[in-house]
Amino acid sequence: MIVAGHQPNYLPWLGFFDKMLQCDVFLIADNVQFSARNFQNRNKVKTFDGVRWLTVPIEHAGKPLPINEVRIANVGNWARKHWVTLKCSYNQAPFWEKYSDFFEQTYSQEWTMLIDLNMHIIRGLMRFLKIEKPLVMGSSLRVSGIGSELALAQDKAMGADIHLSGIGGRDYLNIKRFEEEGIKVVFQDFQYPVYPQLHGEFVPNLSVVDYLFCTGGKIWRTEKQATLRS
């Protein structure tokens, strides 16, 4: 069984869903420490003024928290601003009408926990991209550890024989320990597709909403990479 995982990011990029497409079970790493310098409460979209960050404000607890305990600071009318930015940026996109209702409804709700907002969006995006994969919340496995040891413990709890990692895993995964437990580690080979965009020259590595509104969510990868099971 191929297991992959990632933190539950806000409006994730296309590579997040590419990894999901290749695995059998996808782990949502909701129990790792929140990082404001990452993409857990922010992401990038393309506007007529260039690339812009959309950031969900969070309450500062004064101590490190796991992602699933982070609360949203409902100040500054952030949700309406995010909705207006999406609308102004993409209302001329070919597939705006098809998907915009979901985002309008999402931003009309009041959210308390960041994990609830992010998972609502992730599940909606999975539906639009026609990705049907079981999701497992890391917090539900009741295993402990950090970094490589946590990933290994989670894989063992789920019965993985292949661990699919993003390229960042090369910096921290102890591949030898995985091999000792009978788990093969492979790394995602994701080539960002070039597609028709609005607002000038092509910009890669944006939130997947750019891809969705511009292409309709057509599948960028036609099948699992055979090398994962070789």
PLM region descriptions:
Residues 1-230:
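Residues lining hydrophobic/aromatic ligand-binding pockets adjacent to catalytic sites
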